[in-house]
């Protein structure tokens, strides 16, 4: 789903102000444990936002009675949008599966996009793609707590680490 959401770009921002790898809106991110302030936004943190996305998807999967297609549609457009489409279909005596619902255009293409990406990722070479590179081994992380308001340049100088490296390890810092 992260490919469909952001093309694996942790700095992605949508026109609706959903941000990060998993394209969390502010309220949804907060609801699933992602902190946000004027200098820090965990929606941009790949590790923390992935944990939050897993929790959110689990919640949606349960809400839509084990139906992953409806859960993914709700991840994209909101559970209220999907619930309203289901109610409308029921009132009209129509099926309530993902493929039959009247959903927003973007959401109608969301699950097929996920299936397409999943199919390609299962056999990249068959579809003309290079195998994925191995993930680089990053050195172990160590947390250093810094008082708010300390300029990144000062942190960089004290730790003797360039600001780009600090940003690499701390993608949730908003500069």
Residue ranges and their predicted role:
Residues 12-33:
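Short, surface-exposed glycine/acidic/tryptophan-bearing loops
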């Amino acid at each position: 789903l992260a490919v469909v959401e952001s093309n694996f770009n942790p700095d992605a921002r949508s026109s609706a102000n959903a941000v990060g790898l998993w394209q969390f809106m502010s309220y949804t991110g907060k609801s699933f444990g992602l902190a946000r302030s004027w200098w820090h936004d965990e929606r941009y943190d790949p590790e923390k936002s992935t944990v939050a996305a897993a929790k959110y998807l689990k919640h949606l999967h349960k809400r839509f009675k084990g139906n992953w297609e409806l859960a993914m549609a709700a991840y994209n457009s909101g559970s209220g949008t999907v619930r309203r489409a289901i109610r409308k279909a029921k009132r009209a005596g129509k099926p309530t599966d993902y493929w039959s619902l009247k959903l927003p255009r973007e959401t109608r293409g969301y699950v097929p996009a996920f299936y397409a990406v999943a199919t390609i990722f299962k056999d990249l070479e068959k579809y003309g793609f290079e195998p994925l590179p191995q993930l680089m081994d990053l050195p172990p992380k160590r947390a250093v707590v810094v008082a708010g308001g300390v300029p990144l340049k000062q942190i960089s100088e004290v730790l003797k680490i360039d600001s780009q490296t600090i940003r690499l390890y701390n993608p949730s810092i908003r500069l």
